[in-house]
């Protein structure tokens, strides 16, 4: 087993951070199940890198941010990457992701961290409130990867940056 990485998952309250994690790691998220508010959890997964090395990843599933709440300071210490999650049916959740990106840029303790943005619930086309092209342009300007995925459990997020 190679090194261990710390990845912080963050975003506005109710955008599906825990659901995405549970589906990607365990394949067991049930759409429509009752939402339980996360305080903070740590998930540990083993990931094979593009170099064929297995690395342990500690995913820090943070409490959903509501108005006035900032990311806890310990989320910036020793973090290798961030996954910023918004819901495509909630424009405020995308604004929160933009603010989180600025907060990370100001507070990170390393010069190089990986940031990935996930737009959840992309299958809810009739309820979309975040313009896909505008979100992609923002991500391109910020030099970060942005992917959209559906609410249902068969999501293939395609997180490799070369895709």
Swiss-Prot record:
Please provide the record's keywords in A-Z order.
Answer: Cytoplasm, GTP-binding, Nucleotide-binding
Q: Which GO terms describe its cellular component?
A: cytoplasm
**Compartment(s) where it occurs, according to its Swiss-Prot or TrEMBL record:** Cytoplasm
Q: Which SUPFAM superfamilies match?
A: P-loop containing nucleoside triphosphate hydrolases
One GO term under biological process is:
negative regulation of canonical NF-kappaB signal transduction
GO-annotated molecular function: GTP binding; GTPase activating protein binding; GTPase activity
Q: What is the recorded name of this protein?
A: NF-kappa-B inhibitor-interacting Ras-like protein 2
Species source reads: Xenopus laevis (African clawed frog)
């Amino acid at each position: 087993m190679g090194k261990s990485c710390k990845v912080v998952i963050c975003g506005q309250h109710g955008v599906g951070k825990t659901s995405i994690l549970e589906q990607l790691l365990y394949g067991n998220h049930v759409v429509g199940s009752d939402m339980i508010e996360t305080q903070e959890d740590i998930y540990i997964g083993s990931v094979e890198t593009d170099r064929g090395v297995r690395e342990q990843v500690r995913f820090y599933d943070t409490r959903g941010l509501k108005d006035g709440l900032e990311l806890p300071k310990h989320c910036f210490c020793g973090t290798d990457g961030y996954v910023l999650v918004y819901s495509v049916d909630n424009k405020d959740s995308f604004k929160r992701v933009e603010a989180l990106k600025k907060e990370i840029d100001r507070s990170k303790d390393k010069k190089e961290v990986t940031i990935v943005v996930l737009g959840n619930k992309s299958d809810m086309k009739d309820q979309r409130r975040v313009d896909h092209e505008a979100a992609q342009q923002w991500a391109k300007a910020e030099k970060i990867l942005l992917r959209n995925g559906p609410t249902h459990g068969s999501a293939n997020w395609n997180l490799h940056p070369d895709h």
